[in-house]
């Protein structure tokens, strides 16, 4: 279910997300663009008129966004960081988190940053697998249906669909996926493993992307339970996402 926001007022919504990764290039243009279209890939997000920018500094990748709208933009900028780092060639991402989110009646000031774009380089075998782990406050909620549906089932479906769509965001050829599977485990955290086999080019970025989408889908579905009294997410983050 996509939550009804029709009675909410339009206010300025701002969020900044970041993650750590060792990359030689920063595909910030792809990150900013991905944030603006996140609702096409994360199934329960509302389309919104997001303005986004991205930059790299001291081993961290940042995306921030603002919209005058009825719902928050934190999931959109998280998605932007994920796609931006994959477009930058990252094979290991750590501490993907929301640094801050705000709701206010006056527009926040965001800096104009020159974004850059670089073609993705695909290297690897025709079989790829990825692992991701997300820390959450309310692990039991992940295991049962919530207002939007069942987090695990929705995440499995979103991952499978998005395993074939990363090339829309990064450009270049799309792997001809022959097999995909996903496993989601809830123990002391939310763990995801994906496996992809392709016919022609390596699906390594797709393995990472589908695992990341699964975790972000779960986060989006339970986010109302993860916020603290100030509406922030101090204890919810994707601690690791990497190729196996």
Curated annotation (Swiss-Prot):
Gene3D superfamilies: Molybdopterin cofactor biosynthesis C (MoaC) domain
Pathway this chain belongs to: Cofactor biosynthesis; molybdopterin biosynthesis
Catalytic activity: (8S)-3',8-cyclo-7,8-dihydroguanosine 5'-triphosphate = cyclic pyranopterin phosphate + diphosphate
Active-site feature positions: 220
Enzyme nomenclature, EC number: 4.6.1.17
Keywords: Lyase, Molybdenum cofactor biosynthesis
Biological process according to GO: Mo-molybdopterin cofactor biosynthetic process
Xref: Pfam families: MoaC (PF01967)
Presence of the UniProt keyword Lyase in the record: yes
GO molecular function: cyclic pyranopterin monophosphate synthase activity
Name of the top EC class for this enzyme: lyase
Role summary: Catalyzes the conversion of (8S)-3',8-cyclo-7,8-dihydroguanosine 5'-triphosphate to cyclic pyranopterin monophosphate (cPMP).
Subunit structure: Homohexamer; trimer of dimers.
Homology family: Belongs to the MoaC family.
Protein name: Probable cyclic pyranopterin monophosphate synthase
Organism whose genome encodes this protein: Pyrobaculum aerophilum (strain ATCC 51768 / DSM 7523 / JCM 9630 / CIP 104966 / NBRC 100827 / IM2)
Gene that produces this protein: moaC
């Amino acid at each position: 279910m996509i939550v009804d926001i029709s009675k909410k007022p339009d206010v300025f919504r701002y969020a900044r997300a970041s993650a750590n990764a060792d990359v030689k290039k920063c595909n910030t243009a792809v990150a900013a663009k991905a944030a603006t279209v996140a609702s096409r890939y994360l199934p329960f997000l509302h389309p919104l008129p997001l303005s986004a920018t991205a930059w790299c500094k001291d081993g961290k990748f940042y995306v921030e966004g603002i919209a005058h709208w009825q719902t928050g933009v934190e999931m959109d900028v998280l998605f932007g960081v994920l796609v931006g780092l994959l477009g930058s060639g990252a094979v290991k991402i750590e501490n993907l988190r929301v640094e801050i989110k705000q709701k206010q009646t006056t527009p926040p000031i965001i800096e104009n940053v020159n974004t850059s774009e670089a073609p993705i380089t695909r290297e690897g075998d025709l079989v790829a697998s990825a692992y991701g782990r997300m820390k959450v406050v309310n692990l039991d909620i992940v295991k049962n249906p919530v207002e939007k549906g069942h987090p695990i089932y929705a995440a499995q479906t979103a991952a499978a669909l998005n395993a074939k769509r990363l090339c829309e965001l990064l450009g270049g050829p799309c792997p001809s996926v022959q097999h995909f599977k996903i496993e989601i485990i809830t123990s002391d955290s939310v763990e995801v493993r994906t496996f992809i086999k392709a016919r022609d080019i390596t699906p390594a970025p797709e393995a990472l992307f589908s695992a990341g989408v699964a975790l972000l889908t779960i986060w989006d579905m339970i986010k109302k339970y993860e916020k603290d009294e100030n509406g922030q997410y101090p204890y919810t983050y994707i601690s690791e996402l990497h190729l196996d």
